[in-house]
Amino acid sequence: MMIDFPVTEETILPNFKGGEKEYAAKMFFDGKNRIMCGRLIPGASIGTHTHETSSEIIYLLSGTASVVCDGKPETLTAGQCHYCPKGSTHTMKNNGTDELTFFAVVPEQ
């Protein structure tokens, strides 16, 4: 099954999960799993949240992300991947000067 993100409508989510500014995402949801192409402008973030019934895989396409997962800070750049296991808590912020773009998968477990 093909998901054509270039023609998928973008959703703007202000203060997503208690984060700063807004998260823009093109999303596919089949009732159980989410596949997203997202972007954060400089200074924007996805707030701290726990993956109680899912994990999350985030692959950076461009920009620099500051991620904290279970209290451990990480800095990610394009081509790197962040994994948040089921039961873990994380947050992500664009602390750079360029737009942050990423591909994310949230499979229910």
Predicted regions and their residues:
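Short strand-connecting beta-turns/loops that link adjacent beta-strands
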Residues: N33, T53, T97-D98
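Conserved short histidine dyad/triad with adjacent acidic residue
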Residues: M36-H51
